[in-house]
């Protein structure tokens, strides 16, 4: 069986930066305890479990402000997905020490929204409802940001927006093809709209790699957490653009033998928040797959927790929000 290891795949710089920030926080004895992460630092349960073993508590839920109310004292880390100004204000009001691990690409979108609001614009934001990144972006200026996820949402936007200065931007981890189609629909409805595509480069090149390399495979395995939007989009790109069957799995335990049976070429990629050892475990199993002598798929991943987080040789001081 041939294996195509899609390149690039796995960790992006924003994820690595966020994990290093949280790891440094766990090693900084001057920070008040407990240390909480407001949501999943990145969307991967293996990573959040590893931080739990490091003494950092992950609090997750659909709304950052509601989660924040569970915290009375200590330190709070904002995740790579970004948070609204209201969350930051409330955390300071509660007397919490705040550390910001927002991805720079997400922060760029927040800056764009702030700037356009100051210039009198309304913003149409393409994103996945219920995902923390749109929650934070909409929260930058909730009075002028309109969240849309699909064509039906666009149809429901008021015609009165034609009388407003208008831009469209997007969640950084969306499918670039979905965003393109939705932006075209918006340009048709609002001909004067300014287009600001904000798909991050890491997401873009990983999607393009799948589009270009997956057609050579019989099936694509995407290793990524179910909450990881960029992982789910990789599977979508494989099916819709590369026309290759695709399955997303969290780790080796979710791999199915029937996906491998009768196949000659298997491609493997990974979401931007998937630990490299978790991906390697999947690749190693597929490499060793023998239809005449099948090794049972493990019920759980065998990757030790201490192999998940980045190694910190010299802990750096943690930058605390003013």
Curated annotation (Swiss-Prot):
Keywords: 4Fe-4S, Iron, Iron-sulfur, Isoprene biosynthesis, Metal-binding, Oxidoreductase. Disulfide bonds: none annotated. (2E)-4-hydroxy-3-methylbut-2-enyl diphosphate binds at residues 43, 81, 131, 172, 228, 230, 273. One of its GO terms (molecular function) is 4-hydroxy-3-methylbut-2-enyl diphosphate reductase activity. The active site is at residue 133. PANTHER family: 4-HYDROXY-3-METHYLBUT-2-ENYL DIPHOSPHATE REDUCTASE. Catalyzes the conversion of 1-hydroxy-2-methyl-2-(E)-butenyl 4-diphosphate (HMBPP) into a mixture of isopentenyl diphosphate (IPP) and dimethylallyl diphosphate (DMAPP). Acts in the terminal step of the DOXP/MEP pathway for isoprenoid precursor biosynthesis. This is 4-hydroxy-3-methylbut-2-enyl diphosphate reductase. It comes from Macrococcus caseolyticus (strain JCSC5402) (Macrococcoides caseolyticum). The gene is ispH.
